[in-house]
From Swiss-Prot:
Interacts with ELL. GO terms for cellular component: Cajal body. Residues 895-907 have a biased composition (Basic and acidic residues). It comes from Mus musculus. Residues 90-128, 687-739, 791-817, 835-868, 891-928 are annotated as: Disordered. The gene is Uspl1. The lineage of its organism: Eukaryota, Metazoa, Chordata, Craniata, Vertebrata. This is SUMO-specific isopeptidase USPL1.
Amino acid sequence: MTDDSLKIGNGLPLVGPGTDVGISSLPMLGYLGKNYASAKVTTDGHCPACRAKGKLSALKPYRISFQESVFLCEDLQCIYPLGSESLTNLISPDSEDCPTPSKPQKRKRLETNCRNSPLPVHSKKTRSHIVTDSEPIVNGKYNGEVCDDFSASFPDTSAHQDPASTAASVEQSEALEADDVVVAATEDPATVSVTSELEMPAKSRCLPLCQTLCVQWKNTQALCWLDCILSALVHLEVLRKTVLEACSREECVFGRLFEMYHQADELLHTHHLHGVTGEDCKKLTSEIFTEIDTCLNKVRDEIFAKLQPKLRCTLGDMESPVFALPVLLKLEPHVESLFTYSFSWNFECSHCGHQYQNRCVKSLVTFTNIVPEWHPLNAAHFGPCNSCNSKSQIRKMVLERASPILMLHFVEGLPRRDLQHYAFHFEGSLYQVTSVIQYQANNHFITWFLDADGSWLECDDLKGPCAKRHVTCEVPASETHIVIWERKSQVPIEEAACLPCMKPNVQPVSGEEQPTCPALCSLAGTATSEPSVAHPTSMAGAPQTLPEIQAVAHGDSVLSGAKGMVDSILPSALEETIQETASVSQVDSKDCLLEDKPVAGSAALVRVLAFQPQDSPGSSGSSLVSSLCEGKLVAPCVDSSFPSQAVSTDLQAVLSQAGDTVVPNPVTDAPVPVLVQELKSLATEKDSQTQLLPLKTEKLDPEQPGKSQASNLRKRETTASSKTVAARSAQNQPRKEDQKRAFVGSWVKGLLSRGGAFMPTCVLSQSRAVSDLQPSVKGASNFDGFKTKSISRRSKRMSRKAKHMEELSPRNSSPPLSWTAALTQAAENATSALLREQEGSRPAPLRHRSPGNESAISPASRGDAAEDQVHKLRLKLLKKLKAKKKKLAALISSPHREPSLSDHSEPASHCGTPASDQSEPVSHCGSPNDCESIEDLLKELQHQIDLADSKSGCTSAPDATSNNSQSHEEILAELLSPTAMSEPSESGELELRYLEMGDSTPAQAPSEFSVVSLNTCLKQDHDYCSPEKGQREVDLHSVMDSACIRTLNLGSPMKTDIFDDFFSTSALNSLTNDTLDIPHFDDSLFENC
């Protein structure tokens, strides 16, 4: 490339690297252009005016001509340096990297003159600042170039200088100080770079050279570990102000330190000023530095003497500043408070889930194996889990209270070398790295601190009595040992957006609410937000840990949240007063809209209801209940497909049990049968969680608006405690007890549901509702014929009877008082397993009372006496049946014997109560006296049951009429359960044998009286119509003869279904072999089933 190739048409040189192929021109910035060498210009590249305001704005050069440029702040709102300096001082000439072909010899001569003679004051060269990395004056390295005697104290750099250049530099300095411009010469023009005076503040530029120097301790007896600590402490501005204001210099260790260091600094500055004012520079002799060393060593020896008993350190042995610095701070508690900060270690193992949170207060924290993205606000590092020993788990330090001076120790160093990256804002203050202690591999420590002009001073006790100035901190990232942050003045966060200004996981200082859980904080209704995990002791609201909140919030259904609410509320609601539970009314229901999630909303409601503080003891819980009924609180927290009433109804039951408040249920327009079934299926799956609860969420009745669920609960609380305990113990029985069915009821209903093909239409219409309500259950495990009678079975039967009468009552009638009988239309279509769960979970001793007699409670003795009377009747009936069984065996053994058909009666006067007017058909097996005796016993038993119900207050609602079919079914279930197997019917015609169990028993031809009586009674009482058939005469002897050789016929599918419902395979095999074990019973007993 020739000189002409760098010129344009008018003879002016080109700007930039050139126009050769492969060389691209630099982008332009604005219309003035951009200096191509801007990266070498500034020390830190930031505007000092913006940095004083907490902002980091870069200074960028703008070209104003082909040879000159000016540095301006990139912030559009900042005009620095315009107005602070004269325009002539702001303009920088072209760098020497850009050649000027027309003036090569002139610039070379100018550089020669700079070495051998002082420059003219008004020369353009004086308006520039030529520096190199090893320049002694600009970089603040006072390496002994003032005089020959002083250079002896700096052996590290004086060898690179010659006496001629040193003297020339002193002459240049004197001339430039008169013009307030600092100029330095260099020996290597190839590495010269242009630096504007705008980098330094005006105060620093105007100060004499001596004020840019700092004295330091010299290394003796391997005390670099102590020298680096003292050098870092004396340059901390916050510490210096505190010590000078509050400490006595005679008694305080740190006061003595600052006093002696200030004395040594004054010695250096005073002698240097004398040399500047014209005195001989030889005044600065080694004697002055000997005096400086004496001051510094004296205070160092005093501090070492105080540390020696605690550190067990000796002269000549190496120590670590990590241990010595905290011990030194403990000597003065008021000084230690400037370094002490509080934080918490948060750890959670991703492998085993082990977690802990430790709060600590320290002045120096050690980090090892830090994450690559480490930052003071993301202070995380890798460590093992103490529980499972899993490696590479993350532990994080969360600052809670930061001190004015923050120190951290890094074993492996920092990930990045740029210390500006680690500046941060905390509680509205800017924290900036001002000191760094470097650790070298040869067990040597060096202190670096940030000066006011933005440069860094290196305090190495092996490099002379004065610190060396550097443009940037030249500490490698891996050798960064201890980092010290200092808190600057309060800076508005919006003005320092370039730095991380938000503190994660801490409470905001301004008092603004920043809740981590919107549902919980909005429902709490308080001004305090929920603290983070790092503050367990200052939590507002519930003392509930994070795993517990997650366990509630991550439920698998809406029902789980509702049941969790019952689990948490019910024990406290039964024991606390209404004032304590009524404080929930202060909940602001509209805030629940913050999080429209079905599970989280109900979980938040659980926490609010369980842990609401007692703010207003005199308030009532009705306001909350009313808001629940209106759907303001629950509906937004539940999914839109789920009706708000489903949860609010359960809440009303809970609140009404806690405080005697009758709560009206809300009216729902349309039923939701599918959702009720889903709730019941979920309740079946979560049976282990709800067995101990008398409240069941299955019993939601969206179709009966007037049914109050509060009155019965209130009545339950007034009952005797013994009955309550007995009722709950009965509920806690194993589930297989509740799942078993009475064998006759199950068998008959299975017959009616399966054998509809040959049944009359009237029977089908009547049995349809019964089969829907009580479907059949297959399996021998459900046969409880050999179970011992107990009070729980009788109470279950009574509750089943009350439920059946409730079902048959009109929908628009007055509501019953008990919430246990509230079965919806959707529940009627549910499966049989769900209905059995519903029956099994109902409290056993609950009784129905009339509305006018709510306060009256029947004594326990009356109910027990009535039940004993019924039990005696049953025992007597069993004796009759056993006697009938024996006669049946005799009848089979003598088939030619004609049974007597005469009618005898046996009065039933066991209890002195008149028999009912309802007539029962006469049986046609055995003797007529036995049949009538059994008939009377059945009537008496039914009457005693009804009488016992009426005396004990167990009457149904006024609108509910009694239904004998249900009671007959249960009576037969109790009567026939002790028998070995089944009792086949004895009707003469096969078409009439709807309930026939087998053909092994002899059958009689019914007389005309018996047939007419049977049909008449059935038609009158139950509108029962048997199929019409022709009258046939059958020979009684032939029937009796053929009855002996008949066996069970299992060929019919109807009979197969019947036996499948009732017998197991082994039972059927035994029936075919032994006919005497099959007793006989009258098929007319099943007329009402």
